[in-house]
Amino acid sequence: MYKRIISRLDIKNGILVKGISLEGLRKLGDPIFFSKKYYNDNVDEIHFQDVVATLYGRDILFNIIEKISRKIFVNVSVGGGIKNEHDIDNLLRLGCDKVVINSEAVRNPNFLFLILELPSLAQIIATF
């Protein structure tokens, strides 16, 4: 069996954060710095999750994905704030390999079936 290491980077306000016993967050720093570190440590995939994008109606992590896709060469997945096909197309164009649908999958389960029709999308991860 092939084993893979997938690093998850939780981001809030453009800063890498670490949850503390489900009670709070500690700021760790620049997500681009840490993703390069994990890339150099030979992870197989990096998952970027904006932990409050939907809650605050924030833009998706487009700027971070655009910067990091030029510096690391592993699979990249993104979650947080994805609401429509346009968001997914933008992420794929910037170098994202997978999308993670959270709140929108709960609000609109048909959304998953709609985006399955996108020819450029290879994998969707839905979390409930």
Sequence positions of predicted segments:
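Conserved N-terminal beta1-alpha1 strand-loop-helix module at the mouth
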Residues: 1-74, 82-86, 124-126
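Conserved anion-binding
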Residues: 11-13, 17-18, 96-128
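Alpha-helix termini
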Residues: 23, 27, 92-94, 115
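Surface-exposed amphipathic alpha-helices with a cationic face
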Residues: 39, 65-70, 92, 113-119
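Short secondary-structure transition/capping segments
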Residues: 58-61, 88-90, 111-115
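Active-site loop-to-helix "anion-binding N-cap" substructures in soluble metabolic enzymes
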Residues: 75, 81-100, 105-109
